[in-house]
Amino acid sequence: MEPLYQYAWLIPVLPLLGAMVIGIGLISLNKFTNKLRQLNAVFVLSLIGTSMALSFGLLWSQIQGHEAFTYTLEWAAAGDFHLQMGYTVDHLSALMSVIVTTVALLVMIYTDGYMAHDPGYVRFYAYLSIFSSSMLGLVFSPNLVQVYIFWELVGMCSYLLIGFWYDRKAAADACQKAFVTNRVGDFGLLLGMLGLYWATGSFEFDLMGDRLMDLVSTGQISSLLAIVFAVLVFLGPVAKSAQFPLHVWLPDAMEGPTPISALIHAATMVAAGVFLVARMYPVFEPIPEAMNVIAWTGATTAFLGATIALTQNDIKKGLAYSTMSQLGYMVMAMGIGGYTAGLFHLMTHAYFKAMLFLGSGSVIHGMEEVVGHNAVLAQDMRLMGGLRKYMPITATTFLIGTLAICGIPPFAGFWSKDEILGLAFEANPVLWFIGWATAGMTAFYMFRMYFLTFEGEFRGTDQQLQEKLLTAAGQAPEEGHHGSKPHESPLTMTFPLMALAVPSVLIGLLGVPWGNRFEAFVFSPNEAAEAAEHGFELTEFLIMGGNSVGIALIGITIASLMYLQQRIDPARLAEKFPVLYQLSLNKWYFDDIYNNVFVMGTRRLARQILEVDYRVVDGAVNLTGIATLLSGEGLKYIENGRVQFYALIVFGAVLGFVIFFSVA
């Protein structure tokens, strides 16, 4: 064991320390702490930077072939129950810690420019720090109980960050929606976790899987019960990774500041669901029915997210549905047995999607100079256009991210997405077709986003269009003088974009099919040997890769004809296919259905319960009080102090008892 492993616990603890110091400062010395803005930012950055350095050290050690290391202490004991808490360092935790810390560090650097004039600047850094700590704690957890603790902490931090601007109604509603939706999945995870412990007597990932299969094979528990436990556990990742049908919270979460969209919705929180599926693979893999549920859930989500993203006009919401779709690819990969492919896409997606979200924040930052600090105007792509000449760094990095997510070689997204599609074709051609069609839609809506934002003429000064958008959003037109041209963002915002562009281009080369170093690292030696037996077939690679690139190029061409060359009118297409257009624009009406069935239904039930509470429960309580009051008022006259009166009462009581028992 390397000495470095003994200090791995510092990786999640250091960001927690930063959050605690700033939090105590904000509570006890609020004004003074807020004045030290830059100092607090540097303090948090230095701590997350140290965690990143330690994470790279652990990753390098694992690459060199060191064995996994687990350190635990007995946290609680009751009879045969012993709960261990500690940390584990293996291939998966080392890889995830590097992803989380690198993206978190770059997001924190970016935040200094994006949130420079926000009065909650210091509080935001505290939230970022505790969120990073929670995610890292989840990554290093050695058992399911500890995962669940940090899982809930991640959810709490998400609530705080999405609702950071709590004085805005939309943000307050969005964080509540995210919190409640995730509670549904978390309750399923809790039930599944308890069910697995009841069956196997363990919270250890490997032990749970082995014991569960032994119990099923010996007939001690039914296979149906094992399926139920596995699906219940999967409900947690369904909510956290915004999978159908618990996906509705993710687009609303864009109400939070853009750096959070990059951190939560690209590299960390939404990836936590895929990470948990990977951790629980010993439980899921031997249960074909559970794997089918996982695969079809992922495929449905990928297709659903892509179809909704086709018509989005808000740049951040378009990226949100894109994230939902890409997470669907990862989950589908896990369900068809593509453990390595799913993790590979998680890694590549984390970097290029973080860059895309930060790029959208840079665009919004520039647009606010022209249209003001109104999200309706600053985030609407219909008011953008021609930004490439004003914001060349942002445009170039956004184009790199767009090419990566579209799966154009040699960018990172091509290698990971192509591997998933290849495995899907072997497992189930229907799943492959869904993934293939989704790839075409991805290319279309991402280049639609790029062309609307960065190409053509700048539309931000069109007052009539501004008034039209504000009226549609139910807001009154604003008056005020703004600039006439957007500007490039400061270095603190463009540097993270340029840094993320490097892995967005190059990191996919770790997983090329003729020398898959990523697969060799993530797999155990036996699994790597099995994978090597299949070898690399050039013809198969060219056919599968050609298909995925071909559909992407078709999507790009259609987007170019519609939004760059204006040869196809999108409005006429919308009129020609109104049902499909409205279905996409209204997000398949999921929000409306959930609102009418669950929200309004719950409110109606609550009103009925209120009536019962008011008339029955309160009535019984009030009646008891009134009866007590009246009896007290009546009995107080008995206490008059005269002995002969007390004797008369006793005589009457005795006489009454005699008569009663005589009759009886």
UniProtKB/Swiss-Prot annotation:
The entry assigns this protein to a family as follows: Belongs to the complex I subunit 5 family.
Gene behind the chain: ndhF
Annotated catalysed reactions: a plastoquinone + NADH + (n+1) H(+)(in) = a plastoquinol + NAD(+) + n H(+)(out); a plastoquinone + NADPH + (n+1) H(+)(in) = a plastoquinol + NADP(+) + n H(+)(out)
MF term (GO), any: NADH dehydrogenase (ubiquinone) activity
Positions of transmembrane segments: 7-27, 39-59, 91-111, 120-140, 144-164, 187-207, 219-239, 258-278, 290-310, 327-347, 352-372, 395-415, 420-440, 495-515, 541-561, 643-663
A Gene Ontology annotation in the biological process aspect, one of them, is:
electron transport coupled proton transport
Q: Which UniProt keywords apply?
A: Cell membrane, Membrane, NAD, NADP, Plastoquinone, Quinone, Translocase, Transmembrane, Transmembrane helix
Protein task: NDH-1 shuttles electrons from NAD(P)H, via FMN and iron-sulfur (Fe-S) centers, to quinones in the respiratory chain. The immediate electron acceptor for the enzyme in this species is believed to be plastoquinone. Couples the redox reaction to proton translocation (for every two electrons transferred, four hydrogen ions are translocated across the cytoplasmic membrane), and thus conserves the redox energy in a proton gradient.
Q: What is the lineage of its organism?
A: Bacteria, Bacillati, Cyanobacteriota, Cyanophyceae, Oscillatoriophycideae
Listed InterPro entries: NADH_UbQ_OxRdtase_chlpt_su5_C, NADHpl_OxRdtase_5_subgr, ND/Mrp_TM, NU5C-like, Proton_antipo_N
Q: What is its EC number?
A: 7.1.1.-
Main location as per UniProt: membrane
Location comes to: Cell membrane
Q: What is this protein called?
A: NAD(P)H-quinone oxidoreductase chain 5
Q: Which domain of life is it from?
A: Bacteria
Any one cellular-component term (Gene Ontology): plasma membrane
Keyword Translocase among record annotations: yes
Membrane topology classification: Multi-pass membrane protein
Top-level class of the enzyme under EC nomenclature: translocase
- Which source organism? Picosynechococcus sp. (strain ATCC 27264 / PCC 7002 / PR-6)
Looking up Pfam families in the UniProt record yields: Proton_antipo_C (PF01010), Proton_antipo_M (PF00361), Proton_antipo_N (PF00662)
Q: Does the keyword Membrane apply?
A: yes
